[in-house]
């Protein structure tokens, strides 16, 4: 175990960081493990563009409140992927009502989004000697997106390693956690300070709502992303109260 931790602390990571709850928790997770961590965000014409602002606030707050992590936190990168809005006409990139489609997926699914994100992250990591990619994909509390599945991520890890001719590791610390466990992980990593940061500064709501404040953070309260975050918060709080 000790040897594994030492090896991790010598590695360099790139976190896919949107500014949401999951990626904020993943960033904290990476900062606990790796010697140097950089962040990567994407502007793909998302309706909830407020998350791009949230990214900068979260990074600022992390640096201010967690000095040990601040020493390991490196450059932030933002890539323009407006083409996703052109090829994937979805409720994530256009003003449409969120609803289920005939294929069983919600129309918030942006085809190929995570596949493209990871490919570009690997290319950037190759140039900057960052051999670990960290993403917030999960198979538990999610909307059924096929590019969030564990087998998809493992397959892409192999493909990227072959295509780049080097070792590529994709870490998904939330893959088998539900939202209640994600709140618990944030608490375990950074205590109440990190939980408060997630509540106040991260952004999840698909509709970009920042005017309504709830116990679990800001959002419309009824889109799929808000529902998952809210339900996870309530289950975590109830579990913590029961444990006490």
Swiss-Prot record:
Its cofactor is Zn(2+). It catalyses: 7-carboxy-7-deazaguanine + NH4(+) + ATP = 7-cyano-7-deazaguanine + ADP + phosphate + H2O + H(+). Pfam families: QueC (PF06508). Keywords: ATP-binding, Ligase, Metal-binding, Nucleotide-binding, Queuosine biosynthesis, Zinc. Pathway: Purine metabolism; 7-cyano-7-deazaguanine biosynthesis. CDD domains: QueC-like. Its EC number is 6.3.4.20. Binds 1 zinc ion per subunit. GO terms for biological process: queuosine biosynthetic process. One of its GO terms (molecular function) is ligase activity, forming carbon-nitrogen bonds. ATP binds at residues 17-27. It is an enzyme of class 6 (ligase). HAMAP family: QueC. Belongs to the QueC family. This is 7-cyano-7-deazaguanine synthase. It comes from Bordetella parapertussis (strain 12822 / ATCC BAA-587 / NCTC 13253). The gene is queC.
């Amino acid at each position: 175990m000790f040897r594994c931790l030492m090896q991790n602390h010598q590695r360099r990571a790139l976190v896919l960081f949107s500014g949401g709850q999951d990626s904020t928790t993943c960033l904290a997770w990476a900062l606990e493990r790796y010697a140097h961590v950089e962040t990567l965000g994407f502007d793909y014409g998302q309706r909830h563009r407020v998350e791009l602002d949230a990214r900068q606030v979260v990074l600022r707050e992390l640096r201010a409140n967690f000095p040990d992590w601040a020493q390991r936190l490196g450059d932030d990168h933002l890539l323009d992927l407006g083409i996703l809005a052109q090829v994937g006409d979805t409720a994530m990139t256009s003003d449409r009502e969120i609803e289920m489609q005939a294929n069983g997926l919600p129309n918030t699914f942006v085809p190929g989004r995570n596949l493209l994100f990871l490919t570009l992250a690997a290319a950037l990591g190759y140039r900057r000697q960052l051999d670990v990619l960290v993403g917030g994909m999960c198979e538990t509390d999610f909307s059924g997106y096929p590019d969030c599945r564990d087998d998809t991520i493992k397959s892409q890890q192999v493909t990227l390693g072959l295509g780049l001719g080097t070792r590529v590791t994709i870490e998904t610390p939330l893959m088998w956690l539900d939202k209640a466990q994600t709140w618990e992980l944030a608490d375990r990593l950074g205590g109440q300070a990190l939980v408060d940061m997630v509540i106040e500064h991260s952004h999840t709501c698909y509709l970009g709502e920042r005017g309504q404040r709830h116990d679990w953070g800001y959002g419309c309260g009824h889109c799929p992303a808000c529902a998952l975050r809210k339900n996870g918060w309530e289950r975590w709080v109830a579990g913590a109260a029961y444990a006490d």
